[in-house]
Amino acid sequence: MIIVSYDISDDKKRANFSKMLKSNGAIRLQFSVYEVRNTKRIMDNLVAKIETYAKHFTADDSVILFDVDSDKLTKYGNAIHRDQAIVYF
């Protein structure tokens, strides 16, 4: 699994970055931390998309990718901020 952690100062850029992660199957664990299923194709695609965002980063912005063995991961608490679907009839 890949853990993506980011600190982006601009609200609009941060929101767009979050939407991009979600559209690539990322699950929000905390406000600026996402979990992504790891395959070479997904990782290559994700890195390419992050590089397009990185061109617009300021000196205060950062994105860190962690390649984590899910069998060695320990989670405490229930801090998963998944968006709930809303359905209108």
Language-model features: locations:
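Extended, hydrophobic alpha-helical segments
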Residues: 1-41
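Short, charged/polar low-complexity linear motifs in solvent-exposed/disordered segments
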Residues: 22-23, 46-48, 63, 83
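Juxtamembrane helix-loop transition sites at the ends of transmembrane segments
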Residues: 28, 34, 46, 51, ...
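Short amphipathic alpha-helical patches
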Residues: 32, 40-48, 69-77
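Short, intrinsically disordered low-complexity segments
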Residues: 36-60
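C-terminal structural segments of small proteins and small subunits
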Residues: 54-89
